Every structure is written in C-alpha cells, then in structure tokens.
C-alpha cells in the first residue's frame, strides 16, 4: 500500500522511504528506476538530489498527469512510461544503479470506489490496475468452478475457496454478477464466521481476483528477472511486498541466486557455482516499517522490504525460478 488518504487531501507517504533512500544512496548520483510510480513519492525524493536521473513506470494511466508535471519540472532528468514493469527491458537503454518495486495496491486505487478494489464499493466489479486483458466481472462470470476455486485458494490463500467458488457459479446462473456488493454478499454467505473478525470475510477472495486480473505474479517474476538484467554490477534491486506470496517469491530469487546460498538448492543445476550467482552475498533479513511509520500510515504494517546487490557475473535466464512458481503462472494463464 503506497499511500494514505487524509480527510482533506490526498497525501503521498511512500512506505519505508527513509530505508529506500539509505539503501539506494541517491546523494551519490546515478540512474534510478521507479517501477511502481504511483503518487511519485520515491521518484520525487530521489530527484531532489541534483546528480540523479530517473525513469518512472506505472501501468495505471491515472498517474500520468502527475508524472507529466514531474517531467516538466525535471526535464531531461525524468521520463515516465505507462507500461507494465515486466516490460522494463523494452524501455531501458542503459543499466541502472537502483531499481525499486513497491508492490500491491495503492490507496489511491483503493479509495477510488469506482475501480472496484474495495469491498465497500457499490460500483462495477472491475479491479483492473491498467493494461489488463479482462476485469474481475468477466472472471467471475466466465471461469469454471474449478478454475475459480484454484484462483481463490492458491492466489488468495482462502481455506473456504471451494464453497465460495460453488456459490459464485450458482449465483451467476440466476443473474450475472456485475457489482462489488453482489460478490461480497455471496462470499459472506459462504464463509463460516461464528464471531466478529478483524479481517473482512471478502479480503482473501478480493486479493485473489485482483492478483489474477492483473497477473501480478507473472508481472513480478518477469519484472524481477528483466530488472536484474539491467542492473549495473553493484547495483541494487529493492522490493517492498505486502503479502506472503510476493515475499516468498522475492526471497527465493534473491537467496537462491546469490553467492552465499548456504546449501546448493535443489532448484539449481548441479554445476551451480559462484558463476551462476546474479547477486552478491545476500543478507536474508526483512526490513519492516518502524512503529512510528505504522502509527502514521497504518496500511504499511504488512510491508516487508528486501534488497539484493547485483554481482559482476554475466546475466543468465533463470529458468528454474519460473519452474519453482509454475503453479501460480499456470493459474494466471487461464483464459477468460
């Protein structure tokens, strides 16, 4: 969650900004890439340092006007592209010093009820972040029960996925599901909640559908690989995650393709050596927001930051990385 919204105005508080700045060291100058531009919080903070230049990327066209203002202000030091960050290799012409990913849903997207991300919305069941092939409405009305179950169970980590999927199919046989509130009612009737819960019963199903609609796992895996290809030796890739699936993927990539992997991973070829290390020694430590930041920006409470440093070794395509998480990739490839 990248921002919070006050009652009077929209304020941008990029998560763990101080930590990102400390890791990326923009005071030394260099070339940076903000792969999830959003409200521009990281980009603006980095561009304050005069010897920096930066490319901003975001799939959401709603951020374009803000990005254009930044282009005008910083001229040849900043350029914005409305593309998916998996296409970073199609944009970059030179290697970067730091590449930043702040994953997940921004509160700008969540607060805009017309986009259908919030289960408090009364609008269309959309959930598209931008440049998506289909909406959540199309997914829940067109996919089979088994496919819906897989999406909700695997991408949402929802234990009651089977009954939720069954009831979605049953409900749509009478009337097409078009509104957020309609899906919320189906989920609430399906869930076995016997006492008040801190977590809304729709949370995991909504997460699953959002991830599926925007192919977030496919984007993340391809984005990390392509970003690594365009990092300078000694360059840093910084990733902030907000749920366990994202963090598991990032951890695996950094840990298994670093020089100090403790034991040869069963996912790496037998001839694995330092020559197959894309990263320098990886410090397997999660950085979390401070208590003060969580008080000021409650959505940051679930954020986890990991970073890795690019080695001098030649880039290679890590096929086993894709194989390891093929279950997620196959689900996101369902035809709608």
Locations of regions flagged by a protein language model:
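S-adenosyl-L-methionine-dependent methyltransferase catalytic core, i.e., the SAM/SAH-binding region
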Residues: 1-336
């Amino acid at each position: 969650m990248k921002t919070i919204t006050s009652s009077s105005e929209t304020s941008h508080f990029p998560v763990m900004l101080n930590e990102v700045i400390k890791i990326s060291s923009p005071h030394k100058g260099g070339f940076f890439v903000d792969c999830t531009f959003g409200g521009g919080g990281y980009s603006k903070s980095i561009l304050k340092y005069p010897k920096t230049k930066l490319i901003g990327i975001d799939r959401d066209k709603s951020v374009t006007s803000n990005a254009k203002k930044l282009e005008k202000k910083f001229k040849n030091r900043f350029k914005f592209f409305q593309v998916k960050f998996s296409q970073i290799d199609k944009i970059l012409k030179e290697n970067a010093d730091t590449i930043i990913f702040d994953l997940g849903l921004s509160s700008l997207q969540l607060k805009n009820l017309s986009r259908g991300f919030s289960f408090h919305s009364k609008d269309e069941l959309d959930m598209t972040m931008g440049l998506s092939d289909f909406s959540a409405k199309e997914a829940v009305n067109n996919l089979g029960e088994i496919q819906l179950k897989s999406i909700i169970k695997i991408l949402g980590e929802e234990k009651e996925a089977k009954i939720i999927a069954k009831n979605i199919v049953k409900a749509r046989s009478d009337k097409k599901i078009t509104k957020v509130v309609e899906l919320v009612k189906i989920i609430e009737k399906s869930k076995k909640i016997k006492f008040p819960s801190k977590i809304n019963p729709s949370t995991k199903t909504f997460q699953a559908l959002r991830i599926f609609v925007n192919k977030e796992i496919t984007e993340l895996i391809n984005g990390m690989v392509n970003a690594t290809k365009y990092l300078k030796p000694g360059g840093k890739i910084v990733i902030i995650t907000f749920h366990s699936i994202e963090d598991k993927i990032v951890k695996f990539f950094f840990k298994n393709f670093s020089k100090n992997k403790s034991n040869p991973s069963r996912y790496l070829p037998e001839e694995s050596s330092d020559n197959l290390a894309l990263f320098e020694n990886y410090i397997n430590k999660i950085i979390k927001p401070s208590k003060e930041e969580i008080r000021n920006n409650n959505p940051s409470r679930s954020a986890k930051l990991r970073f890795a440093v690019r080695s001098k070794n030649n880039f290679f395509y890590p096929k086993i990385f894709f194989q390891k998480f093929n279950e997620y990739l196959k689900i996101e490839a369902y035809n709608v």
